[in-house]
Swiss-Prot record:
GO terms for biological process: translation. One of its GO terms (molecular function) is structural constituent of ribosome. PROSITE patterns: RIBOSOMAL_S6E (PS00578). Keywords: Ribonucleoprotein, Ribosomal protein. This is Small ribosomal subunit protein eS6. GO terms for cellular component: ribonucleoprotein complex; ribosome. The gene is rps6e. Disulfide bonds: none annotated. It comes from Archaeoglobus fulgidus (strain ATCC 49558 / DSM 4304 / JCM 9628 / NBRC 100126 / VC-16). InterPro entries: Ribosomal_eS6, Ribosomal_eS6_arc, Ribosomal_eS6_CS. It holds the Pfam family Ribosomal_S6e. Belongs to the eukaryotic ribosomal protein eS6 family.
Length: 129
C-alpha cells in the first residue's frame, strides 16, 4: 500500500510530493483530517509537524472534513469541498469520501504547522539529485 503525500509549505507557498510506503503508510491509516502527524512518517526531520488537510481516493473523490468514517457517500451539496456552485442557491448531489484515511485513499494533502531547522527546499533538492 502506498500514499502520495502532498506537503504544502505556507512560508514559501510551494508544495512537495512524497510517496509513502510500507510501515509508514500503515501509520497513516485511521488518521483524520485535522490530525497533526510527525514529519518522520514522510522522511522529514523529526522536528517537522504536518497537519492533514484533505485528500482524494483512487477514483478522484475528495475527502470531506464534515463526513465521519471512511465510506464514500453521495451528498446533496450547496458548496464546500467537492462542489463549487456557479450561482447562488444551486445544490447538487455529488460523491465524496469520509474524513478518515483508509486503504482506498491515494493522495493525502498536508500543511506544515511546525518547521524544522533545515528548510524543505534543501531537503527535497537533496533527494532529487
Amino acid at each position: 500500500m502506498e500514499f502520495r503525500v502532498v506537503i504544502s509549505d505556507p512560508k514559501t507557498g510551494r508544495a512537495y510530493q512524497k510517496v509513502v510506503e510500507g510501515a509508514n503508510a500503515n501509520r497513516l491509516i485511521g488518521k483524520q483530517i485535522g490530525d497533526v502527524i510527525s514529519g518522520t512518517i514522510v522522511d522529514l526531520p523529526p522536528d517537522y509537524e504536518l497537519k492533514i488537510t484533505g485528500g482524494t481516493d483512487r477514483d478522484g473523490f475528495p475527502m470531506r472534513p464534515d463526513l465521519p468514517g471512511t465510506a464514500r457517500r453521495r451528498l446533496l451539496l450547496s458548496g464546500g469541498v467537492g462542489f463549487r456552485p456557479k450561482e447562488k442557491g444551486l445544490r447538487k448531489r455529488k460523491g465524496v469520501r469520509g474524513r478518515v484515511i483508509s486503504k482506498d485513499i491515494l493522495q493525502i494533502n498536508t500543511v506544515v504547522v511546525k518547521h524544522g531547522k533545515v528548510p524543505l527546499e534543501e531537503i527535497f533538492k537533496q533527494k532529487e539529485e
